[in-house]
Amino acid sequence: MGFKIITGKYETGTQEQQAGFMQLFGEKNTQFKFDLYFHWYNIIHELGHCLLSMQNKRIDLVDEEMLVNAFAVGYWKHAGNSDNLKKFSSMLESILEIVPNPIPAGMEFTEFFRSIWGSEQLNTVAMYGFFQLSSVLEAMKLNKNFSNILDEMGLECGNLSAMKAYDREVTAENAESVLAVALENLRLFGNEIADIEIEFADNPEVQCANCYN
């Protein structure tokens, strides 16, 4: 079985697609913000999905998204640039200030999204974006112990201070090195992890992880 992270580029999107991301991220530094989310943070998020698949972990899909966001946040707190994390957190907070909260009064976050998971109601930029951005900020707020997160995912955790730091520029071109360093760090802990490749797509709306035979 092989694993692949497919990630679209902002710069190859249509004018309409780019305009949509400008509306989401703002007109200033849209390219950087897109890359910060999708080619820095989200590479580790999608890696989390691959790792759960490798470990044959089958959990509720909403819980899986929450777990891989906790994994990505925890990873970057140990292996990332703290300035990037601050920029990332600030960016998410700014976006959520303008994205309407769709959760009905009296319903919990996870309860609501479990009720609409897999439906057309979820498949809008505003709805799914609210879910993902909110769950990332929730992971930042909870600040779970990274070793506990790895254990929950069925992975070994070694000396966190020995992790290799990633400090390259945030660009689409560096997405492969983001993944390479993360795999190196996880293998350093004694985890046997299959190779994972990155495939770039012209469509910036395509962001996912696939496993194939």
Spans of model-derived segments:
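Short, flexible helix-coil linker/hinge segments at the edges of structured domains or between repeats
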Residues: 13-24, 92-101, 105
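Structural signature of transmembrane alpha-helix termini at the membrane-water interface
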Residues: 51-54, 79, 197
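Active-site scaffold of zinc-dependent metalloenzymes
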Residues: 1-35, 50
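Post-HExxH zinc-binding segment in Zn-dependent metallohydrolases
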Residues: 62-96
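Generic structural signal for hydrophobic core residues of well-folded globular domains
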Residues: 47, 51, 75-76, 116, ...
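Pan-zinc metallopeptidase signature
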Residues: 103-213
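Active-site recognition of the HExxH zinc-binding catalytic motif
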Residues: 41-54, 65, 69, 73
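Soluble non-cytosolic domains of exported or imported proteins
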Residues: 30-38, 42, 58-62, 66
